[in-house]
């Protein structure tokens, strides 16, 4: 899958202070982007929105998505949605642990692109 062409689009403000350490941010972005890239058909979108309620970071793709009845399960250590793709089922559990350690929350839904949308909600400070 590393040779496929993927359009990556960004919807980001010029500046935004995300309340998370650099290493933790890189770890969770790496896991989410790796999954999005691996499972997308041709497009991944990264967006960040700041509001009075806090900051929302969203990674979404145009892949197969995640069925609603599987969303909680795939965030557990050792669980994978699809055994046909490589992986150990650890990445999303690590992402969830990192996010929760910062008082943020992770939601998983449908993307307007047609695939999955992983949203990280950091509360306002």
Give the positions of each predicted feature.
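Conserved polar catalytic motif of the HATPase_c/GHKL fold
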Residues: 30-31, 35
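Short conserved segment of the HATPase_c
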Residues: 66-78
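Short alpha-helical Gxxx[C/S/T] motif in the catalytic ATP-binding
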Residues: 91, 95
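Short beta-strand/loop element within the Bergerat-fold HATPase_c
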Residues: 43-53
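Conserved catalytic submotifs in the C-terminal HATPase_c
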Residues: 7-17, 52
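Acidic ATP/Mg2+-coordinating residue in the GHKL
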Residues: 61
């Amino acid at each position: 899958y590393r040779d496929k062409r993927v359009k990556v689009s960004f919807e980001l403000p010029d500046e935004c202070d995300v309340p998370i350490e650099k290493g933790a941010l890189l770890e969770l972005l790496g896991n989410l982007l790796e999954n999005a890239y691996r499972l997308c058909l041709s497009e991944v979108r990264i967006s960040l929105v700041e509001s009075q309620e806090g900051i929302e970071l969203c990674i979404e793709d145009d892949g197969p998505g995640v069925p609603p009845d599987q969303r909680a399960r795939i965030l557990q250590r050792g669980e994978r949605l699809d055994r046909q793709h490589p992986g150990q089922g650890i990445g999303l559990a690590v992402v969830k642990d990192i996010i929760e350690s910062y008082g943020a929350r992770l939601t998983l839904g449908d993307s307007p692109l047609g695939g999955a949308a992983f949203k990280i909600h950091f509360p306002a400070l």
